[in-house]
Amino acid sequence: MKKTFPEDRVNIGVNKITPYQPGKSSDSLNISKEKLIKLASNENPIGPSKLATKAISHIVEEAHRYPDGNGTKLKQKISKLEGVPLDSITLGNGSNDLIEFSARAFLTNGDNALYFKHGFAIYPLAILATGADLRELPVTENYHQDLTSVINFVDKKSKVVFIASPNNPTGSANTFSEIEAMLNDLPNDLIVFLDQAYFEYIEDEQY
């Protein structure tokens, strides 16, 4: 007897998801890796530092051991560098992981989450996987994210707002004062996920 995949058992939100399309590889473009600089993938074209490769080589020697699942030493370093308490730091396997963590932690069926059009493709995928509804916000003619408009799309079912600054792939960014003004407008119980994965590209002092 031939068995079919029980699609009706799959989470309704997951059934709405279309596969994420990552950036094309150098092989698919028929371009050597040395000639390709993938800004959208946030890749470092000059390679890892010698200090990083040296540290990795030492870690390999302990690959048979489970690492500290809490990442205590790394959190201590980040805490000292950024001046934030340890219990305010969460580690993840890249920003995708943290986005999905946040969606699962704060969203469920019947909620909605907001994000801007032309934003990072992972936002709607992470939202849908929880069963929550999408609320896509429009951008201006020059693809700028107008943060003053966010409050107009918020209702009682809104739980999370995802904002990338600078945004990938449009490259638009919001200033510190724009973000601060938006936070003052929004309800105190609304979670704002500020994605600054590409902040190294910004040179504007107002950022």
Task: Tell me what each language-model feature is.
Residues 42-45, 95-96, 120, 165-170, ...:
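Short glycine-rich anion-binding loops that position phosphate/pyrophosphate groups of nucleotides
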Residues 105-163:
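PLP-dependent aminotransferase-like
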Residues 35, 88, 133-135:
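Conserved beta-strand segments of alpha/beta enzyme cores
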Residues 64, 72-112:
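Phosphate-binding glycine-rich loop
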Residues 47-49, 99-100, 123-124, 170-171, ...:
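Glycine/Thr-rich phosphate-binding loops of Rossmann-like dinucleotide-binding domains
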Residues 2-65:
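N-terminal "arm"/small-domain region of PLP-dependent enzymes with the aminotransferase-like
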Residues 141-205:
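Active-site phosphate-binding strand-loop segment of PLP-dependent enzymes
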